[in-house]
């Protein structure tokens, strides 16, 4: 019976693992003459090359250093007059706020509650839990955050109809009781809006504005046209609403928010004349959501009548304009160019990885390609000192045999029998000599193969030629 080999101790296995950790691996280049595999390899390389050349370098301009979010300054000015049923309105009345910043509102409809004074009056019927039948239904001193004043505890008739509501102490009459509506949008589409915008990219020390370098009379006679006059930033309000895809009359009655987006995408490798603003317009508030669509706000005008403080409450519906500026500037830089070139060259290796996987998974009959692909070379064993060899020569005895890897002849004999050994002899695999060694192994990860060759012969690279016909195809 064959003696059972004891399992290697843990310490020995750890030493073997530590020794294997310091092994060096280097690629081995083999040429596989296979047309379908070559087509796949070149196709993958071509796709990767097109991706980097067209998308990365041409579209994304990855060879440039870039900066996003320019420093921006915006000044706006509105001009025009309009009229309601009984009044003419000018800019000072329908533009809020009047400072001319990046966000402003143009009032297109108002609901006016005039001559409000401090007193007691019926609460609005739209306030929750305000309808009543008796005074007991109203709690004196109660303050509703959604109401218009402090409840007095009385139940009084409403402004119109037969309903009753709780009486409150505050500004009277309340908004529902005496509000009058005025439409200001009749001439509003012809309002003109001047938008002055200047941007600065600090990384590249580049600045530019959206107004052409001309005299002062230029802005008095021009209007914006993206094709013919892009540096005249004077827009008609009707043009802005139309470009946003909205109906002006509907928007003027309910109000809404329109965004004027100015985009500065600049390629600073080109002259500054190629860096031009691009304008786009869209509605920003969700018009299809009834609970949040529209735009309105309230303000009041105070005055005194017969020594009594009086105010006019105005609920204003309007078109709010938000001017939004964004952009990106890019300029050639060596560092991102080198990084992206290195990434491109490295990514081409994906084709080799894919083809290796196809080769070794689907085309590796009889492990022909594995034997050619993987080799493991062991360093020749050297004695720690020459005194055993010298002593043996003096005594006339054979020197001690060196420790070396198993010969390919021996491995071939064990693996495939005498016939494989004869094939190994025909390929030049001889018995190793004890003094000149060149060890290697093919497709045998846990064993090293030693091979002795004369000094004039080069070592063979493939030690297990199991299929000569398959090897001839490589």
From Swiss-Prot:
It comes from Cavia porcellus. Its main location: membrane. It is a multi-pass membrane protein. Belongs to the P2X receptor family. Residues 445-474 are annotated as: Disordered. The gene is P2RX2. It catalyses: Ca(2+)(in) = Ca(2+)(out); K(+)(in) = K(+)(out); Na(+)(in) = Na(+)(out). This is P2X purinoceptor 2. Residues 316-329 are annotated as: Pore-forming motif. Glycans are attached at residues 129, 190, 247, 306. The chain crosses the membrane at residues 43-60, 334-354. One of its GO terms (molecular function) is purinergic nucleotide receptor activity. Express in organ of Corti.
